[in-house]
Amino acid sequence: HKLDFGEFDEIDYSLIAIHTTLEDYRLAYFINQKLHVNLNKSIKEIQITVKEGEAHFSRFHYYEKKKEISWDLIQNKNEVIHQQKEENQSLFSNIIDLEAAKKVYMLPEFKKVEYFLKIENCEMNLNLLEIMNKLNTIDNVAMTYIVDTNRIKSKNNLIF
């Protein structure tokens, strides 16, 4: 018997990009009000290893038992603090440890997006345009759009 790994590549979620200046907890609060869901901050942040170290992204989660739909509000931008050694070319020639912050992204191909709303198992049950229209009524949400999942190069970052 042979396993076909193509079966695991099947995408059973929708992804909505959200452009906003809101903090994650405020956005989650407004989404809860507008969409009648109950997103709660997850204890387990999403961890991704980048060349500068470990990156952590906040996640708010809600599982709708009746419809078996999983909702996740995911931070796309964060910073990784990493150590840099710099030689001081002075009389005493010291090596200085510097901390540098580097911007990192959950999905690097979408650098302008602040958050993603990932909705799993939502094929027939939800109207994504209606969800986007409701998200767009939140103050400080500049724009939302459905992400073409075929354009995502870093799909593995969405498996958690």
Place the predicted regions along the sequence by residue.
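Short, flexible, solvent-exposed loop/turn segments with mixed acidic/basic and small polar residues
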Residues: 2-9, 101-112
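Terminal, regulation- and interaction-focused segments at domain boundaries
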Residues: 5-23
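Amphipathic alpha-helical segments
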Residues: 22-38
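Short, surface-exposed beta-strand/loop "edge" segments at domain boundaries and coil↔beta transitions
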Residues: 23-28, 66-70, 81-82, 123-129
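Short, well-structured beta-strand/strand-turn elements
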Residues: 36-48
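Surface-exposed, low-hydrophobicity interaction/linker segments
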Residues: 50-99
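Glycine-rich, aromatic-bearing surface loops/beta-hairpins
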Residues: 104, 112-160
